[in-house]
Regions:
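A C-terminal functional module that forms or caps the active site or interfaces directly
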Residues: 219-287
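N-terminal basic/disordered segments at the start of proteins
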Residues: 2-13
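Anionic-ligand binding region
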Residues: 191-216
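Solvent-exposed alpha-helices and their adjacent loops that cap or buttress functional pockets
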Residues: 11-14, 19-20, 111-114, 119-121, ...
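Glycine-rich nucleotide/cofactor/substrate-binding loop typically near the N-terminus or early
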Residues: 24, 29-31, 37-92, 216-232
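A generic, well-ordered mixed alpha/beta core segment in the N-terminal half of proteins
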Residues: 51, 71-121, 125
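General beta-strand structural signal in soluble alpha/beta enzymes
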Residues: 20-22, 55-59, 101, 119-124, ...
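Active-site glycine-rich loop that binds ribose-phosphate moieties when present
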Residues: 104, 133-146, 150-171, 205-209
Length: 301
């Protein structure tokens, strides 16, 4: 089964031009309509402004799509939470039932790789959830990063996670964790986590050379490029950690588990911060889109 690409994406791939994959969970689960559609189209516009071709990824009527039309993005936004989040395990069911599915980081990587897209920009990856030593709640995103040949540009793992354990799993999976002009892992809403990345990238060109080296040497798996949130949108570390702790406590009390955890926590954090965390989330995605496209341009030189 092939993935469907739109004309713009197909042409760019044929001409070895930078195509940037984008997930659709941020549209369906990340924020309400019409803000979700406006944000998705703005991210696409930023990629174009920097000389790349955006490819928003999802499953529509059972068809895997890499490069949605604006009309499809609009419909995705309107359907919102009624569209299920789809990770690797869910893809066969959604395709067989000819349903709609919102692509997580893992699914976006799978479909991007099938279409021949090397680069994928997102907000933050999933990882090891707090308390995973008893719940075993570990995102499938980490497994995908270990196996699938896509470079992911993000602002680190989502701050609601156990970041030290997430780094340990990435090390086990052989995933290089690179920091764009930082030697410290960004923590999504904040620029610093107190944890070191594997290597600090000084330039777009250096990032491109490292990706080429991994591909040319035949090492399967992803490359993770972490890019800190812009300073002006960074949140106070102590304040956001207190909010996250409060949100996790409420989630545990309500018995929320599995793939419902992340949407609940992000929405609760946005509620407690009066929307500031959502604004930070949007701005870091915009920033990642710009940086990711510049790296992709260097890669295809």
């Amino acid at each position: 089964m092939k993935v469907r690409t739109n004309e713009e994406v197909s042409k760019a791939l044929a001409e070895h031009k930078p195509v940037i994959a984008l997930e659709s969970t941020i549209i369906s689960h990340g924020m309400p309509y019409p803000q979700n559609v406006e944000t998705a189209l703005k991210v696409e516009a930023i990629i174009r402004e920097h000389g790349g071709v955006p490819a928003t990824v999802g499953i529509i009527d059972g068809e895997a799509v890499v490069g949605m039309t604006p009309e499809e993005i609009e419909e995705f936004g309107k359907r919102g939470l009624s569209i299920p989040k789809v990770s690797r395990r869910d893809i066969p069911v959604i395709i067989a039932n000819k349903s709609w599915g919102a692509s997580t980081v893992a699914t976006t990587m799978i479909l991007a790789a099938k279409a021949g897209v090397e680069f994928f920009v997102t907000g933050g990856i999933g990882g090891v959830h707090r308390g995973a030593e008893t719940t075993f709640d570990i995102s499938a995103d980490l497994e995908e990063l270990g196996n699938t040949n896509v470079t992911v540009i993000c602002a680190g793992a989502k701050a609601i996670l156990d970041l030290p354990k997430t780094l340990e799993i990435l090390e086990t999976k052989g995933v290089p964790v690179l920091g764009f002009q930082t030697d410290e892992l960004p923590a999504f809403y904040t620029r610093k986590s107190g944890l070191k990345v594997d290597h600090k990238l000084e330039s777009y060109a250096e990032a491109a050379e490292i990706i080429h080296a991994k591909r040319d040497f035949g090492l399967d798996g992803g490359v993770l490029i972490t890019n800190p949130i812009p300073e002006e949108y960074s949140m106070d570390t102590d304040a956001i950690n207190a909010v996250i702790d409060s949100a996790i406590k409420e989630m545990d009390e309500k018995g929320i588990k599995g793939k419902e955890c992340t949407p609940f926590l992000l929405a609760k954090i946005a509620e407690i911060t009066g929307g500031k965390s959502l604004e930070s989330n949007i701005q870091l995605v915009f920033n990642n889109a710009a940086v990711g496209t510049e790296i992709a341009k260097e890669y295809y030189k």
